[in-house]
Structures are given as C-alpha cells and as structure tokens.
C-alpha cells in the first residue's frame, strides 16, 4: 500500500486519521509546530519584560484586572512557559496553560464587541487569531511533544 493509499486509515500511534501526508516526519512536524507556536510568545514576552512599566500601562488601558500582577503573569506565560513548549518540556501542561492564557488575552485584549469601525476590525482580527492559536495548543496537548523534546529525553513522555 502506498503512502497516499494509506491516508485516511487509522494511524497506529495516534489513533487519528492520516496524521501526516508523508509518514515518518510526524516528530519533525511537531517540533516545527512547537517552535512556531512559541515564537510569538517569546518575542512579545521579551518585549514585555524589557518595558515592564509599559506593559502595566497597556493592561491598565485595556481595563485588565490587577495590572501589575497581570503583567508579571503575562511575562511568565510568554517567556518560561512558551520556552518550555519550544524545547518540549512539560509540553502538555504548558500547552494547557497557554490555552487558558490566550483565552484571557482574547477576552481582555480583543473585545471587538465593545468597539466600532476600524477598531472593531482590528480587535476582531486579534480575537480570532487568539482562538486559532488556542487550537494549535490544544492539538499540541493531544499529540504531545514528539520525539525531539525534553519530555522524551527525560522519560516524561514516550517517543
């Protein structure tokens, strides 16, 4: 049976239909997904850390709760937790934390239902991008870190 014929059949490892178009690169694709998902958070987490007072001001302007604490939580989620995803350490727990964090940022930072015009379009764009990112983290929770990860290296997860 060719690889294309096997598409749609159950994948023995994940139980999902056709986990990859080309079998054998699942772990490489999971690594790429982890790195891509983490990139946004690492870039903006570093920015938030470098301008902590600006981060607090932005949260205050958005009407976020406890801006000083919220800024610290944002930096924690976007730097060490996203870094854990990137290297595949505590991947499932980190992915779930980032799902919850991203839901919070969507609901606090992108309330498109409270604005009109161009602001509404921008907020709606951010809101639905956040939902899409949440979907990526949920998939990462389901698949796990893959072979190229600290989780596998330390025996936390099977390859």
Model-derived features: where do they sit?
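Extended, low-polarity transmembrane helix blocks
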Residues: 2-51, 68-159
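Short juxtamembrane and helix-loop transition motifs at transmembrane-helix boundaries
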Residues: 52-65
């Amino acid at each position: 049976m060719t690889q294309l014929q096997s598409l749609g059949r159950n994948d023995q490892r994940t139980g999902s239909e056709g986990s990859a178009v080309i079998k054998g690169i699942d772990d490489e694709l999971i690594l790429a997904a982890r790195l891509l998902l983490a990139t946004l958070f690492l870039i903006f987490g570093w920015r938030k850390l470098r301008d902590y007072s600006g981060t607090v001001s932005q949260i205050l302007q958005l009407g976020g709760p406890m801006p000083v604490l919220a800024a610290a939580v944002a930096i924690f989620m976007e730097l060490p937790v996203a870094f854990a995803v990137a290297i595949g350490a505590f991947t499932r727990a980190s992915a779930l934390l980032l799902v919850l964090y991203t839901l919070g940022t969507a609901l606090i930072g992108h309330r498109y239902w409270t604005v009109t015009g161009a602001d509404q379009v921008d907020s709606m764009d951010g809101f639905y991008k956040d939902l899409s990112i949440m979907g990526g983290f949920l998939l990462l929770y389901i698949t796990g870190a893959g072979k190229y990860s600290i989780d596998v290296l330390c025996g936390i997860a099977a390859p």
